[in-house]
């Protein structure tokens, strides 16, 4: 039953179309030393508990004979960096992917949306929500290093975008991570549509 909530979240993500063509990966902290993460190449809308494998948070070592998701290093970094994090969700939605490419700077700044309050600690729509945008890379260790350097300057909150790739977000548990994902996806779609209207 430990993975039941995460399995349900993965199926919900699949139904939303936020992880098409087996894209994305989802994980849950198992204990201080390890996490469960989706096996590579599986449809996230049809997962069950057997589709997750255990990965060591410090070393990234996985169960022999099974291949963890490509971005496993991002998940294990977040579990090391934030001991309070209990779940990480990485998705490939259209709005997150488009906005990550359209954003000219290294940070997507959102303000004026009531749904900003879906993010833990946000209490006012006038406050700015800053989501870091990183260049995509197939070199995950190098990407993790860049993310860690940026985090040392401006601590990450809620999630970050990878250009042309998608969103990675997290929470203290599956429920909070799912709430952050849904809130951010709503905000991204609003911002995308706002920019389209202003460009006309």
UniProtKB/Swiss-Prot annotation:
Residues in coiled coil: none
Molecular function GO labels: methylthioribulose 1-phosphate dehydratase activity; zinc ion binding
Cofactor(s) of this protein: Zn(2+)
Recorded catalytic activity of this chain's protein: 5-(methylsulfanyl)-D-ribulose 1-phosphate = 5-methylsulfanyl-2,3-dioxopentyl phosphate + H2O
Entry binding sites for Zn(2+): 90, 92
Keywords linked to the UniProt accession: Amino-acid biosynthesis, Lyase, Metal-binding, Methionine biosynthesis, Zinc
InterPro entries: Aldolase_II/adducin_N (IPR001303), Aldolase_II/adducin_N_sf (IPR036409), MethylthioRu-1-P_deHdtase_MtnB (IPR017714)
SUPFAM superfamilies associated with the record: AraD/HMP-PK domain-like
GO cellular component, one term: cytoplasm
Pathway given in the UniProt record: Amino-acid biosynthesis; L-methionine biosynthesis via salvage pathway; L-methionine from S-methyl-5-thio-alpha-D-ribose 1-phosphate: step 2/6
The record's free-text note on cofactor binding: Binds 1 zinc ion per subunit.
One GO term (biological process): monosaccharide metabolic process
E.C. code: 4.2.1.109
Family indicated by similarity: Belongs to the aldolase class II family. MtnB subfamily.
Known function: Catalyzes the dehydration of methylthioribulose-1-phosphate (MTRu-1-P) into 2,3-diketo-5-methylthiopentyl-1-phosphate (DK-MTP-1-P).
Name this polypeptide is given: Methylthioribulose-1-phosphate dehydratase
Lineage, highest ranks first: Bacteria, Pseudomonadati, Pseudomonadota, Gammaproteobacteria, Enterobacterales
């Amino acid at each position: 039953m430990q993975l039941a909530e995460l399995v349900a979240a993965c199926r919900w993500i699949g139904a939303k179309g936020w992880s098409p063509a087996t894209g994305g990966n989802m994980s849950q902290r198992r204990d201080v030393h390890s996490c469960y993460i989706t096996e590579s190449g599986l449809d996230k809308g049809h997962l069950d508990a057997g589709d997750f494998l255990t990965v060591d948070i410090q070393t990234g070592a996985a169960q022999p004979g099974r291949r963890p998701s490509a971005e496993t290093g991002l998940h294990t970094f977040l579990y090391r960096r934030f001991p309070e994090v209990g779940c990480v969700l990485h998705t490939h939605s259209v709005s997150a992917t488009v906005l990550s490419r359209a954003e000219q700077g290294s940070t997507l700044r959102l303000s004026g949306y009531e749904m900003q309050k879906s993010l833990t600690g946000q209490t006012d729509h006038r406050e700015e929500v800053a989501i870091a945008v990183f260049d995509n890379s197939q070199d995950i260790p190098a990407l993790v290093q860049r993310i860690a350097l940026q985090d040392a300057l401006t601590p990450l909150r809620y999630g970050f975008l990878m250009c042309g790739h998608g969103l990675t977000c997290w929470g203290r548990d599956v429920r909070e991570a799912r709430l952050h994902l849904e809130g951010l996806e709503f905000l991204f779609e609003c911002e995308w549509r706002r920019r389209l209207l202003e460009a006309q």
